[in-house]
Amino acid sequence: MDFCNIALFENVSHHDCERMMQCFHATNANFPAGAVICDYEKTSGRLGIVLKGMASLIRTDENGSRTILERVGEGGLFGECLAFSGNQDAIYVTADTDCEISFITYDEISKRCSNACACHTQITENLFRLISEKALGLSERVEVLSRRSIRDRLLCYFNLCADHAKQTVFSIPFTG
């Protein structure tokens, strides 16, 4: 996958994308379907970029119940919202299909490189935008779940989907 097609590298040239991945000391790894890609309870401090495949960010509660927090497809990021949280929850990422993942440590993104290049600033801005979009999505989720009846929840959800699609015909995520 071309890194320039990833939201984190929006408005960064192809040459600078390649250079920044070297500057970030990015490492690539392949995972078979069903494998644990990253366990944030044990190993935090890494941002993952899905280059191929589909992965799920999962939280396990004290009773062993699993909740899918997010599904991440090609070009998607995971771990960006856990960057500076000091999270101790049982959160991990699993491969839904065979996956190729590129890992970058938070320190490599948050600290300026010795070159102080403009593309590093752009990537940092993109990361903040992606985190903001994710926070907005979570607030929308709270808005839907705070409705009293199932009917009101569905209407609220459908209205949000229509707003995002900017039309009254839209696709619902997690459906075929």
Annotated model-derived regions:
Residues M1-A33, L82-A83:
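Cyclic nucleotide-binding regulatory module and flanking cytosolic helices
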Residues F24, E70-F128:
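Cyclic-nucleotide recognition modules
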Residues H25, S132, L136, L155-D163:
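Amphipathic, well-packed alpha-helical segments that form the structural scaffold of globular domains
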Residues A35-T97:
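Cyclic nucleotide-binding regulatory domains
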Residues R112-H120, L138, C161-V169:
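Basic, amphipathic alpha-helical hairpins
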Residues T124, F128-I131, A135-L138:
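Long, hydrophobic or amphipathic alpha-helical segments
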Residues V144-R151:
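Conserved phosphate/pyrophosphate-binding and hydrolysis machinery centered on Walker-type P-loop NTPases
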Residues I150, Y157-G176:
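Phosphate-/nucleic-acid-contacting segments
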